[in-house]
């Protein structure tokens, strides 16, 4: 049983359902997918006392417009796109309101959770959309989004007026240095190259997406530009022939043939996901 909640007036630059991703399918070539910014998605659900794995609506950058079909409690987190409702707190949206995200100020990915959770089609155990693999698709204008009609008859105690503490609301314009675990081909890179990687700022390019974030900076020169293809995990820092790193993201291939200098710590990958094209990031090694 579901309840119609939003009419998509405009999906903006992209709108999909995402959750914590699908597990156990990598050996079949299916990436985990899931929310690009797990930190923001988690807080959207947590504010409403939803299960942390409940589907959320992931919006890209700006431009989305949603007509509210009935009164609903919701939470908006993630990128700042000048939403016309308060963010990082629970909000009671009224029927006939239009939720808008007109202009991006910082960050890339926006998250909306609704009390009880969205109803999303589960494919291979997850509601996360993986468009390249045709597991679900992005929403288009005119579609209706529904929530699960659960057993709750009143809002859980303490949810109304709840907000995220200031220390957990991230300033996406100023990311910290991202921590890196050593990669399996770290020895392909000279000490000079490692010092160059960790000592230089790297610029996120406009070719970055859910598959991978491409960085540009001083060219690295691994001793071998290709290896026999092997499993690749989300967050791997691959260095192709041009010497410009690519960080694999939630929809990345599950195998690859480029040497891997390291892997971004999972807790820091959400920071990278929210870096806009042109933004600079730095990395620091995790000492083992």
Please identify what each model-predicted range represents.
Residues 1-288:
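Conserved "landmark" site that anchors the functional core of diverse proteins
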């Amino acid at each position: 049983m579901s309840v119609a909640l939003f009419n998509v007036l405009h999906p903006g630059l992209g709108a999909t359902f995402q959750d914590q991703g699908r597990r156990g399918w990598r050996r079949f070539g299916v990436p985990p997918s899931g929310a690009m910014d797990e930190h923001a998605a988690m807080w959207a659900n947590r504010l409403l006392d939803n299960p942390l794995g409940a589907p959320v609506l992931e919006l890209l950058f700006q431009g989305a417009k949603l007509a509210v079909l009935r009164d609903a409690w919701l939470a908006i987190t993630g990128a700042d796109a000048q939403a016309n409702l308060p963010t990082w707190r629970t909000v009671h949206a009224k029927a006939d309101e239009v939720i808008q995200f007109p202009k991006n100020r910082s960050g890339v990915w926006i998250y909306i959770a609704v009390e009880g959770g969205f109803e999303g089609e589960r494919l291979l155990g997850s509601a996360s959309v993986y468009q390249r693999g045709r597991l679900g698709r992005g929403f288009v204008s005119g579609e209706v989004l529904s929530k699960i009609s659960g057993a709750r008859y009143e809002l859980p105690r303490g949810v109304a007026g709840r907000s995220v503490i200031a220390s957990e609301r991230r300033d996406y314009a100023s990311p910290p240095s991202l921590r890196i675990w050593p990669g399996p081909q770290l020895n392909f890179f000279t000490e000079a190259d490692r010092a160059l990687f960790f000592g230089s700022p790297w610029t996120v390019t406009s070719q970055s997406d859910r598959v991978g974030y491409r960085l540009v900076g001083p060219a690295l020169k691994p001793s071998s530009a290709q290896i026999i293809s092997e499993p690749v995990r989300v967050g791997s820092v691959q260095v192709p022939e041009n010497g410009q790193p690519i960080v694999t993201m939630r929809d990345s291939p599950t195998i690859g043939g480029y040497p891997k200098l390291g892997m971004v710590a999972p807790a820091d990958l959400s920071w990278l996901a929210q870096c806009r094209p042109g933004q600079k990031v730095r990395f620091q090694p995790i000492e083992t």
